[in-house]
């Protein structure tokens, strides 16, 4: 395609992603700007979802610690935290029909939820978006950040939003609209787990050279409306065991009773699993047939579905947080605390810490004659420091660092020792005394997969009944996923022959199973040959393929802005 002339816009700060971390950073910067008489300091947030909250998926039980700091009067301001946790239970599923409730004293303290709230994180984020706009943050939903822009010295200059109206052949259609260049003093990347631009930045600046490999899980969620007689508002249930234990997969589940007779339920399967026959979506469907879970769902109706990879490497896997011209925040860096099964409060805190550091850097530049605002003179930007290392220092001195450090062994213990022994290790580490050493998990998730001839067990997944259990296509339908059909695939293969020639014979092409949206298929042609088919329009942007493909042959890039799921109340 020929060179395209693009319009550009200048901001002091550009933030990629309107999730908990991105919006918290934007809010903190604008709060400080107003308090310190820099009202013209401009902040822009771009969001690839059709609206703020459209791509937000979480359990969620929210710990309000960071929110208390950002908005001490959040209750009076109408934040949608309406259901305090009233009961907190943990279970071991011993088989497909039996279970055992764990005494509260046996549960690691990190998983105690007194003082927390059952929420729709999507609705919390929508509220944060409103608060950001009240502070005059420019929030642009429906604009996907597709490229990173660089200065000649290698520092980040900003981002380019994706072109609209490019056909499958890569050529402009009659609907073509070029993307914008958004330039900034500082660009913050808040894309969530496995952000495609964050991934590039980590590689380009070698930000993970001193970190353990990052680790991930796939979270699969359903929202149900249940019989009011069975609903117990504020009841929080977590558990592990069956069905994951049958394949040796580390994983767990949740079931939360929210407001309006709704329950949020789902599973998280660690992507370190080694059996190529594991099918996380069907593991969830099978899990719902357990009597402990089924009792709540019978007579109810499934109203929404979604899936998203979660980052779980924690303290040991954090990359360097800063680089010239920008920072990584939230799950783009990996701040989720898996020992709590929570990342919203940590994402928010990382954004707030970064926001403080960014504001201080801008204020220092202004004191030396630099300008702020939409109409500033960009040639004067050399008075502003390039790399805001103060963000790292603020993190090091914060409760966020302390919380992640204290939980650093949780994930590695589960991976090294399994659910039962690892669980015992974590009980001692969290409830009795701190283990005085650090465990490391140095095998990337994609390398954990064994070949089909090296495993003996193949799970049996019953056919869905359409009432309690479902297939992937009907599930994607209620995720409200929409993409422009006539656009290039956003799922890029480095080598188109690998799925059939390498992955199929070695691992029975696991993309057929690890994708929770049915994007990848092996199709048999009339002549008996096999073909790898990508149904990109089904994609719910979970990023599992980018993580788990054993050949690391699939790269997820952003499709047109506004595409993907449209999660309501998730």
Describe the function of each predicted region.
Residues 307-338, 475-486, 499-514, 521:
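FAD-binding beta-loop-beta segment adjacent to the flavin cofactor pocket
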Residues 100-121, 130, 158, 268-270:
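Helix-loop-beta segment of a Rossmann-like dinucleotide-binding subdomain
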């Amino acid at each position: 395609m020929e060179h395209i002339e693009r319009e550009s816009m200048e901001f002091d700060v550009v933030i990629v992603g309107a999730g908990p971390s991105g919006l918290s950073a934007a809010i903190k910067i604008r709060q400080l700007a107003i308090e310190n008489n820099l009202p013209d300091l401009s902040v822009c947030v771009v969001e690839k979802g059709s609206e703020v909250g459209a791509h937000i998926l979480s359990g969620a039980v929210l710990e309000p610690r960071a929110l208390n700091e950002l908005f001490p009067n959040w209750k009076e301001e109408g934040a949608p935290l309406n259901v305090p946790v009233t009961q907190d239970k943990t279970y071991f599923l011993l088989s497909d029909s039996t279970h055992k409730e764990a005494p509260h004293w046996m549960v690691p303290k990190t998983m105690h939820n007194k003082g927390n709230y059952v929420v729709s994180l999507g609705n919390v984020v929508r509220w944060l978006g409103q608060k950001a706009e009240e502070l005059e943050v420019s929030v642009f939903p429906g604009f996907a950040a597709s490229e990173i822009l660089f200065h000649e010295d290698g520092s980040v200059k900003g981002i380019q939003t994706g072109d609209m109206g490019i056909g499958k052949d890569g050529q402009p259609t009659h609907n073509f609209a070029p993307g914008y260049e958004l330039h900034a003093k500082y660009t913050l990347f808040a894309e969530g787990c496995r952000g495609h631009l964050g991934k590039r930045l980590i590689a380009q600046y070698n930000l993970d050279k001193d970190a353990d490999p990052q680790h991930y899980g796939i979270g699969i969620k359903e929202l149900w409306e249940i019989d009011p007689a069975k609903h117990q508002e504020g009841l929080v249930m977590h558990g592990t065991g069956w069905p994951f234990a049958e394949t040796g997969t580390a994983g767990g589940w949740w079931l939360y009773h929210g407001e309006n007779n709704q329950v949020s339920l789902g599973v998280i399967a660690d992507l370190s699993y080694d059996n190529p026959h594991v099918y996380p979506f069907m593991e969830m469907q099978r899990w719902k047939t357990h009597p402990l879970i089924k009792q709540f769902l019978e007579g109810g109706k499934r109203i929404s579905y979604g899936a998203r990879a979660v980052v779980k490497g924690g303290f040991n896997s954090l990359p360097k947080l800063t680089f010239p011209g920008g920072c990584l925040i939230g799950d783009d860096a990996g701040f989720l605390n898996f020992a709590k099964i929570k990342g919203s409060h940590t994402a928010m805190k990382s954004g707030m810490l970064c926001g403080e550091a960014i504001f201080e850097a801008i204020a220092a530049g202004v004191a030396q004659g630099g300008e702020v605002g939409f109409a500033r003179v960009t040639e004067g930007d050399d008075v502003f420091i390039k790399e805001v290392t103060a963000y790292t220092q603020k993190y090091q001195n914060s409760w966020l660092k302390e919380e992640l450090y204290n939980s650093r062994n949780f994930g590695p213990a589960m991976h090294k020792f399994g659910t039962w022994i690892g669980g015992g290790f974590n009980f001692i580490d969290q409830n009795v005394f701190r283990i005085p050493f650090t465990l490391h998990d140095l095998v990337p998730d994609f390398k954990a997969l064994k070949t089909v001839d090296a495993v003996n067990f193949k799970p049996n997944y019953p056919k869905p009944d359409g009432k309690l259990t479902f297939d992937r296509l009907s599930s994607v339908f209620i995720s409200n996923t929409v993409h422009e059909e006539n656009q290039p695939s956003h799922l890029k293969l480095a080598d188109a022959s690998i799925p059939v020639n390498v992955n199929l014979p070695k691992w029975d092409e696991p993309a057929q199973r690890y994708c929770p949206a049915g994007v990848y298929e092996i199709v048999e042609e009339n002549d008996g040959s096999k073909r790898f088919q990508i149904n990109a329009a089904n994609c719910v942007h979970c990023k599992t393929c980018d993580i788990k493909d054993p050949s690391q042959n699939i790269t997820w890039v952003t499709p047109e802005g506004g595409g993907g799921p449209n999660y309501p109340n998730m």
